[in-house]
A protein has these predicted regions:
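N-terminal transmembrane alpha-helices
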Residues: 1-34, 47-62, 66, 90-97, ...
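Short alpha-helical transmembrane segments in multi-pass integral membrane proteins
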Residues: 1-13, 67-131, 178-229, 286-352, ...
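Small-residue hotspots at the loop-to-helix junctions and early N-terminal turns
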Residues: 36-47, 121, 125, 184, ...
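Helix-terminus/linker motif at the lipid-water interface of multi-pass membrane proteins
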Residues: 21-40, 108-115, 171-178, 239-266, ...
Length: 428
């Protein structure tokens, strides 16, 4: 069992880190090509990315969990979950496409951009929103391939799509001189690579996933999303945090402060990806064991996942405390002293929260995998919306920028109590 856990988790960690490099690569190359204005524009529109990924995650992961559990129970209706998930993603994507075509400038302004930032970010926003169906469907394909016993292919899909993004970020932004538009194109095309790689498994004889046509059903969508909601909130919480923090930081420190937060937030994406890797690597195993009634095995996977998250959190905090100046300098091409000061202190304070966040991310995924929706939903709402918003406003009012950075660890600490209570209720 330990070997199986290591196989699934290690491959999912690599895959999720690869996915996080979508934004990190954009941040790095944009900082070199456009400077702090580009980072600010990117950070303001990140919540839109988060929303797109969150919807794809909720539908994809939720449908994949229902598929595995029902398939193991012998329910033939499970065969239409894949088609149903893709169909809903495409239908929902139309909303994002229309916004991207007609009002990307208004969207950037609504998210806090002034006239200079709107001019910098509107074309970037338009381009990536036009490719929304591919982002969402990539998440669905990856979740089903992973849950169908092919984590290696799922990992390769995310890694190679991210590698494409990084390479073409450079090519389009520098040799071809396309600037922000080049970064958007590279990021927008990369999920197509992921989908094509997933098709290697989906079109093979080993694949048990069927593309059986189904009429779109709101009832079935909600049923799938009930167990995918923790994945939704795990993704969307980053967007909510970004919007709240941007609003507060614009008031406290202006555009330079938002650029500093961009460094902190985008670096933290890699950390979140590590914990999502543990969570999503554990989830297929737990869903499988749970569907077969093997509760002892579920408990063993749970313990290994929690210990892994604590170990990774400790290593992350040690790394950031030691190398915060170096991490900041990578994104500070203009050598702005204020940006460096804000970002270095922000990294050190913000990252302490991953001791608790790791447990919360892993715990939420496990609760969803065993269909314990109540606690998974409560924890997701607490960490993604309620606690982080309350602490951000309260601590920033009391301690300024230091309070902004401390809001994340405070919110994760409070949420951890819900997760621990939910896991204890399972009596594994």
């Amino acid at each position: 069992m330990k070997k199986l856990f290591v196989k699934y988790v290690s491959q999912n960690i690599l895959g999720m880190v690869g996915m996080s490099l979508y934004i990190l690569a954009d941040t790095f190359f944009i900082s070199k090509a456009v400077g702090s204005k580009g980072i600010t524009a990117l950070n303001l529109v990140l919540p839109v990315y988060n929303l797109i990924f969150a919807i794809g995650a909720m539908i994809g992961v939720g449908s994949a969990i229902r598929y595995v559990v029902e398939k193991n129970k012998g329910d033939t209706s499970s065969e239409s979950y894949f088609f149903h998930a893709l169909l809903w993603c495409i239908m929902i994507s139309v909303i994002f496409i229309l916004i991207g075509i007609f009002i990307p400038d208004r969207l950037v302004g609504l998210l806090g951009g002034d006239s200079a930032i709107i001019n910098t970010g509107k074309s970037y926003t338009r381009i990536f929103m036009l490719f929304t169906p591919f982002f969402m469907c990539n998440y669905v394909c990856n979740a089903f391939v992973r849950n169908d016993g092919a984590p290696s292919i799922a990992m390769c899909a995310t890694l190679f799509s991210s590698l494409f993004n990084i390479v073409f970020d450079y090519i389009l932004m520098f040799p071809l001189g396309l600037g922000m538009e080049g970064a958007a194109l590279a990021t927008a095309i990369s999920p197509i690579i992921g989908i094509l790689i997933c098709c290697i498994h989906l079109c093979s004889d080993k694949c048990s996933v069927k593309l059986n046509p189904a009429v779109p059903s709101v009832k079935r969508l909600i049923y799938s999303c009930q167990v995918g909601v923790s994945s939704f909130v795990a993704e969307i919480s980053s967007g909510v945090i970004t919007i709240v923090f941007n609003m507060i930081i614009l008031r406290l420190a202006g555009n330079i402060g938002v650029a500093a937060y961009g460094v902190v937030a985008n670096t933290s994406l890699v950390a979140v990806a590590l914990f999502n890797g543990i969570a999503q690597g554990s989830q297929p195993l737990i869903s499988d064991y749970y569907g077969r009634g093997l509760r002892k095995n579920v408990g063993s996977i749970l313990r290994m996942a929690v210990v892994s998250s604590l170990l990774i959190a400790a290593l992350l905090i040690l790394f950031i405390c030691t190398f915060a100046p170096f991490v900041t300098s990578v994104f500070n091409s203009e050598h702005d002293a204020r940006l460096a000061s804000y970002a270095e202190s922000g990294l050190r304070l913000y990252f302490t929260g991953f001791i608790f966040a790791g447990i919360n991310i892993v715990g939420s995924a496990i609760l969803s995998a065993v269909e314990s929706v109540k606690y998974a939903f409560a924890a997701s709402i607490m960490r993604g919306f309620i606690a982080i918003t309350i602490f951000a406003f309260a601590l920033s009012a009391a301690f300024g920028m230091t309070g902004v950075w401390l809001a994340f660890p405070a919110a994760e600490f409070v949420t951890m109590f819900i997760i621990v209570r939910g896991l204890r209720q399972l009596k594994l």
